[in-house]
Design a protein with these regions (language model features):
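Extreme N-terminal leader/anchor segments
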Residues: 1-49, 98-104
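Long, well-ordered core segments of solenoidal/helical folds
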Residues: 56-68, 115-133, 176-196, 229-249, ...
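Solvent-exposed loop and edge beta-strand segments that line ligand/cofactor-binding
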Residues: 80-92, 104, 135-152, 191-207, ...
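Non-membrane alpha-helical segments in proteins
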Residues: 90-105, 117-121, 152-164
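Structural helix-adjacent loops and short alpha-helical linkers that scaffold large soluble proteins
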Residues: 103-116, 161-182, 217-235, 272-288, ...
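CBM-like, beta-strand-rich accessory domains located in the C-terminal region of large
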Residues: 133-135, 339-341, 390-401, 405, ...
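Active-site lining segments of carbohydrate-active enzymes
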Residues: 138-256, 267, 354-366
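Carbohydrate-active enzyme catalytic cores, enriched for enzymes
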Residues: 262-390, 397-442
Length: 629
């Protein structure tokens, strides 16, 4: 463990969080944020973000505040649907965020009035926790004191708004905000504490909740001793959060939850350092540096990621967070530069949008290069190679070959996943892989599905995003991969080029036998070999699946293996081949037509945001009788 709590006990913190230091930090931060926010209005790189802010402000003048009614709150319990309530909830937060930022830039009276209205609307909500996170069986803690991710975010948001605009807001509004943050968050977490599960969680909840509650305590608690006790407690929670990462810095929840959890960890660390007069720095360990590099390591090209677990392949990274991490690491990032608009984030997160404005440094960004990254504790491999001309890459499995064409200078990439099937936001995806061609995942991971009650309930493996049937892995004797830590990928062989360039010789071999409950299966290994072709004219991925089955006396028991390949691109078939054509690259799979016949299924589905799309499942089946299929 990092043991932040041991390094910074309350007895040590109390002298660093006295009133004088706090007042100085408050004045300096308010001045710096205000100055920087106003400067960004005229800077072209922020134009899209400010257009979103003005669009939301205009809408707020023309329409009333959306209502979070109690019947809407009850809808999750009755139907399992989360989205109807959450859409209104996040619209409220986004509207308030836009109004506050616009008011800081130009404090027109109507804007300040709308800010006050928004603050009062949020203070009157039944609970700040989402219905999906309210524990109805908890008879001790009422819903309005159940502190989840979004209650914590709300407390942080309101505290930071008071920091920025408190002197200009109506005193009754300020008092009401302080009272509600105290009653709904600070009291149940610190002063009359209940134990929340996130306090000892080893995933994003620990960091987000500790950050939100910790920043609210820093900004709103006046007693130095009480503040020190609160911060010590949150540092203990952050110790658990860091324990969820291996020494390789890999995030098993995927890059989206890395942004969420580690991003809020950084936001809290920065605020704690500022409000301790630069005395408390919790970002000094080597492990923090490894975690900070995670997004770069799983980035394939053009803002597209290896998106295992519940993450999107097109994750928009907060430019403020990435800029801050670049400063922490003392180098430019290989990630593409983009300042996200307010409306690009469905959750309209205040913490991200504020820091995108006050922290972003366009000079901190660069461009991706050919490289191999392997995260041994996480079990993920990423290989990136840049082609020099129109070329092809090949993949083979069971004698089949795939060919990918790509344009000159295109980034060709491959990623494979090991790990186990009991990870946070787990998908049953051991041995799954991604093939990437210049900004597109041609063979892909579907990422997160639409969050409902069923998505996090027993039997969730039937959902295609979670099932191994929605990944590029085989179905063995009609069985999918099983859930649980006993299903794990054991690394049998790994070779990565010493120069970390994606050259001949990069390979990974996994034993995946335990992933499948098929009784007849005694051995299943999958081997990947990524090769850059001579002259850097493309790359070849070779996949070899090796199966052994039980025999009955002198004969082997019947068996069958159905290989699956998942893509958002509709494949084209011909005599002995399947091809997936992207915008700049194409994957071609060649196979023995005497032995195999592909079956292609178009599957209608909805993504994490409820938007309909179609993906394509290609299957090729082998069986013990060796008859054509």
């Amino acid at each position: 463990m990092s043991l932040l709590k041991e390094a910074w006990p309350a007895s040590r913190l109390v002298t660093m969080l006295d009133g004088g230091v706090q007042d100085t930090a408050r004045q300096r931060l308010r001045s710096e944020w205000t100055k920087r926010l106003r400067a960004t209005v005229a800077e072209p790189v922020y134009a899209e973000l400010w257009m979103d802010i003005e669009r939301v402000c205009k809408n707020s003048r023309e329409t009333p505040w959306p209502e979070l009614s109690f019947p809407l709150f009850q809808q999750f319990a009755h139907t399992g649907e989360r989205k109807p309530y959450e859409d209104v909830y996040f619209e409220q937060r986004g509207r308030l965020a836009a109004l506050v930022l616009a008011a800081v830039a130009d404090s027109e009276p109507w804007r300040m009035k709308e800010v006050e209205n928004g603050l009062l609307e949020i203070c009157q909500e039944y609970t700040w926790a989402l219905p999906a996170h309210v524990r109805e069986e908890d008879t001790v803690t009422p819903p309005w004191q159940q502190v989840d991710l979004f209650a914590s975010e709300t407390a942080q948001m309101l505290a930071e708004i008071l920091l920025l605009l408190g002197e200009e807001l109506n005193g009754h509004v300020v008092a009401g905000v302080r009272e509600e943050v105290e009653r709904r968050v600070l009291e149940p977490v610190f002063w009359q504490p209940r134990h929340f599960e996130w306090e000892t969680a080893e995933h994003n909840w620990a960091a987000v909740c500790a950050s939100g509650c910790g920043i609210a305590a820093l900004l709103l608690t006046e007693d130095s001793q009480g503040k020190a006790v609160a911060i010590e407690k949150m540092l203990g929670t952050l110790d658990y959060f860091l324990e969820g990462y291996g020494e390789d810095g890999g995030c098993p929840e995927g890059v989206g939850y890395w942004v969420y959890g580690f991003g809020y960890f950084i936001y809290f660390a920065d605020m704690l350092r500022a409000f301790s007069g630069e005395a408390v720095n919790i970002l000094t360990s080597e492990k923090i540096g490894e975690i900070a590099a995670f997004a770069e390591r799983v980035h394939l090209s053009d803002g597209i990621f290896a998106n295992y677990s519940d993450s999107s392949e097109t994750e928009r990274l907060p430019s403020g967070l990435v800029s801050n991490l670049n400063d922490l690491q003392g180098r430019r990032s290989a990630l593409p530069f983009h300042v996200s608009g307010l409306l690009e984030d469905p959750c309209r997160r205040w913490a991200h949008v504020l820091r995108n404005l006050v922290w972003t440094n366009p000079l901190a960004f660069g461009s991706g290069e050919a490289a191999v990254d392997y995260l041994p504790q996480l079990g993920w491999m990423m290989c990136r190679s840049r082609s020099s001309s129109r070329s092809s890459s090949h993949s083979s499995s069971h004698g089949r070959a795939a060919r990918t064409k790509a344009g000159s200078g295109a980034m060709l990439a491959f990623s494979a996943k090991g790990g186990h099937n009991n990870e946070p936001h787990n998908h049953n995806d051991l041995g799954h892989f991604i093939l990437h061609g210049d900004g597109e995942n041609l063979l892909c991971d579907l990422g997160a599905g639409l969050y409902t009650k069923a998505y996090f309930s027993p039997g969730r493996e039937s959902i295609v995003n979670i099932s191994s049937g929605g990944h590029s892995v085989p179905v063995v004797n009609g069985t999918m991969q099983q859930s649980g830590a006993r299903a794990k990928a054991v690394v049998l062989d790994i070779a990565v080029d010493e120069q970390k360039e994606a050259r001949t010789g990069t390979r990974l071999k996994l034993d995946l036998t335990s992933a499948y409950p098929a009784e007849e299966l005694t051995v299943f290994t999958r081997s990947f070999a990524w090769t850059v072709l001579e002259g850097n004219e493309g790359a070849r991925l070779t996949i070899t699946d090796h199966f052994e089955f039980e025999s009955s006396g002198v004969s082997m028991k019947p068996w069958d293996v159905e290989e699956l390949l998942i893509s958002r691109f509709q494949p084209r078939t011909g005599a002995g081949f399947v091809e997936w054509q992207g915008t700049k690259a194409a994957v071609r799979l060649d196979y023995d037509a005497n032995m195999l016949r592909p079956r292609i299924e178009a599957v209608k589905h909805v993504d994490h945001d409820g938007v309909s799309f179609v993906f394509y499942k290609t299957s090729l089946k082998w069986c013990s009788d060796r008859k054509p299929h």
